Amino acid sequence: KQGGPEEMRWEEVALPEMQKDDVLIKHTAIGLNYIDTYHRSGLYPMPVPLTLGIEGAGIIIEAGENVKDLTVGDRVAYASPPTGSYAEAKVMPADRLVKIPDNISDEIAAAIMLKGMTVEYLVRRTYNVKAGQTVLFHAAAGGVGLIACQWLKAIGAKVIGTVGSE
């Protein structure tokens, strides 16, 4: 049932059958995003019943026979459909996963995937920022803003950030 958080329920559900290009992930951390609230409320209609969440991290516990670049035991993260990260485990197409570097925790990986994709879109695709350019970034203290400012600095851009409380 769609609605507020009071409509959420903890239930046992069967995982979908794995395909040859899928992996089974045991979640160790998940990301919480505005889009999850949109799915839950019905603002972005989704078929129900629904397991929320599009961002997570975990350990591969099973790999389909066609999966070559990932193996059981790999730490991976994702930010893409199908929904279902609000669960202990998830079947996921292997080509939608990235390995988590050893120096990044599962919690950080799960929390930055969607924000990082947003920043990549802004600083590489919307406008390909180059070293020496100046960028004004509003909401620099938010999740996207913090990643953007670090990314822009790494590129060599001069960053001017704005923040506010209202």
Please give the residue ranges for each predicted region.
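Cofactor-binding loop segments of dinucleotide-utilizing enzymes, especially the Rossmann-like FAD-
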Residues: 1, 28, 164-165
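Extracellular beta-rich ligand/substrate-recognition surface
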Residues: 1-7
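Conserved hydrophobic/aromatic beta-strand scaffold that supports enzyme active sites
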Residues: 10-15, 57-59, 89-91, 97, ...
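Glycine-rich beta-strand-centered segment in the early N-terminal region that forms part
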Residues: 14-31, 41-84
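NAD(P)H dinucleotide-binding glycine-rich loop of Rossmann-like/cofactor-binding domains
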Residues: 76-139
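Gly/Ala-rich phosphate-binding loop of Rossmann-like dinucleotide-binding domains
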Residues: 119, 149, 153
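Adenosine-nucleotide cofactor-binding segment
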Residues: 137, 153-166
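Hydrophobic/small residue at the entry helix of a nucleotide-binding pocket
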Residues: 143-144
